[in-house]
Curated annotation (Swiss-Prot):
Annotated Pfam families: HlyIII
Subcellular location: Cell inner membrane
Protein name listed in UniProt: UPF0073 membrane protein BB_0117
GO cellular component assignments: plasma membrane
Annotated source species: Borreliella burgdorferi (strain ATCC 35210 / DSM 4680 / CIP 102532 / B31)
Length: 233
């Protein structure tokens, strides 16, 4: 209730685009585009799975789609408010929390469908447990350093390497390429995010724009993996 009351104190004047730095406006618009694509993509995946009467696919794609859409929604809201505003600090926390959810949400279809056994379930439990721990950590420590956040995201993203053989076996060479390509681009994005904190504001802003573009490319890569390959299992 307290958080709801805080949010009610803000009006549309807080979203005056003249107060938003150019890079923040770019980040908002680019990830608003991500919201639209995520909703369309989720609808396609769920519709295909429903028509094929694949209940497991429907569930895991809903989880994946929700996590992807949530990330772009939180990122858009975070970047649209002026720097220094209280509501921006609130959405900064939500923005980081949504990254943990996206990582776990992307793992869900891959592990549940490509590794449908005990080992796949174990990986899922580990990743979702780390996501929950990460969420709790972000709630308690809002201003944790960028290098720490980026490092945790990268480590979570590559836990899948422990089950790389069955996944490689399940996917074709091209399917495996999109999995790895997306992971590498996400990783590069994480590194860019970490390094951007070490430069002056002007360079930082430009690197942050690059970071946002890389996130869109990586999520598009993994969506193609879901649509073209995983949905056909």
């Amino acid at each position: 209730m307290l958080r709801e009351n805080k949010l009610k104190n803000y009006s549309l004047s807080d979203v005056n685009t003249s107060k938003i730095p150019k890079n923040e406006l770019f980040s908002s618009i680019s990830h608003l585009f991500g919201i639209i694509l995520s909703i369309i993509g989720t609808t396609i995946l769920v519709t295909i799975s429903t028509l094929k009467k694949k209940d497991l696919h429907v569930v895991v794609f809903l989880i994946y789609g929700f996590s992807m859409t949530l990330l772009y929604v939180m990122s858009t809201l975070y970047h649209i408010f002026p720097k220094g505003s209280k509501i921006k600090k609130i959405f900064r926390k939500f923005d980081h929390i949504s990254i943990f959810i996206l990582i776990a949400g992307t793992y869900t279809p891959a592990c549940a469908i490509l590794v449908p056994n005990k080992s796949g379930l174990i990986i899922l439990c580990i990743v979702w447990s780390l996501a929950i721990i990460g969420i709790i950590f972000k709630i308690i420590f809002t201003n944790s350093p960028g290098w720490f956040n980026g490092s945790i995201f990268i480590i979570m993203g590559w836990i899948i390497i422990f089950k790389i053989k069955p996944i490689y076996k399940a996917l074709s060479g091209k399917g495996f390429f999109w999995l790895v390509f997306g992971g590498i681009v996400y990783t590069i994005g994480g590194i860019v995010y970490i390094l951007s904190k070490k430069f002056n504001p002007t360079i930082n802003m430009k690197m942050h724009d690059v970071f946002h573009i890389l996130i869109i490319i990586a999520s598009a890569s993994h969506f193609w993996l879901m649509l073209k390959y995983i949905s056909n299992f």
